Amino acid sequence: MKKLLIDCDTGIDDSIAILYALKHPRVRVMGICTGYGNSSAAQSTENTLRIIKLARPGYEVPVAVGAAAPLNGNWPGPNAIVHGANGIGDIELPESTQKPIEEPAPEFIVRMAREHPGELTLVTLGRMTNLALALQIEPKLPRLLRNVVSMGGTVFAAGNCSPVAEANIAGDPEAADMVMHAGFDLLLVGLDVTHKVQLTAAHLASLDRWCAPENRAIADYILGAMKHYFRFNRLADYDLDHCPVHDPLAMLLAVDPSAGVYRKMPARVECGGTYCRGMVVTDRRIVPFDSPYITVCLDVDVTRAVETLLAVFTEKDPAI
């Protein structure tokens, strides 16, 4: 059983990643931390609670509220064009009776890591602010967590919030740089691979037809939320009838890394600069600079990834 902690800014793709983890028969979600990004920390928390209710995992999943802004305090607010006014495509899910715990997310991460040393995989689907704050509380955190899988960054592909930067890393470069040179066993799942894994209308039609009866409400939510995501991606990608699933791919590889191709390399994040702030700077020279290595996913089995993602919600075994 894979034990996961999830840190997210629950938007459309975050919600699908969370649903994937909660419905996976060989995953136990030990808790979810929320923060700013796709929406405010408060809205992300509300979305997360409603997603847990939708999933009906059959066990308690504590939710801890995290950072409301980056380490430097400057956050312009969410972009409703991408994820909708409420962060989940303006779909109104039933309200949950569950409340977030009082413990702030960074403290929750530290406590869980201390209680389960070497057992937990932390999956970050948004900015790394909560993890950076947790690291300030407990400098030994890299040795307490089994590993960290982060959706963020790009090495060879173009950026999505600037020519060279990806939104999660650029949203708090100082936090990301702190995490990258702290010594975590860190896997970066960025735009190099997430743009390769695209959900199409045909994939959604298959989900609609073959979803397991107990997952009907989940499938209906995904279909509705993805309509908004498709509309945005048609505007951003010149009417192409598909869209990437950034966060679900990171979650999928956290559960089963065998679908990816990886390379270890030293990496830091550019925290200054007029044009390159938020860029992941990797050293691919024969003799690299002296910096801790991270692992970067550079390729993925696209067909397998899509089939595995959808299989959790159908009657197929997700370990295809």
Q: What is each stretch, according to the model?
A:
Residues 1, 20-21, 28-29, 170, ...:
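Conformational coupling and interaction surfaces
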Residues 1-10, 63-69, 88-90, 129-135, ...:
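Short, mixed-charge, low-aromatic patches
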Residues 2-8, 12-50, 56, 86, ...:
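Active-site histidine-anchored catalytic micro-motif
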Residues 38, 69, 128, 140, ...:
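Residues that cap or initiate secondary-structure elements
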Residues 59, 125-127, 182, 245-247, ...:
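Short, basic and Ser/Thr-rich N-terminal targeting/leader segments
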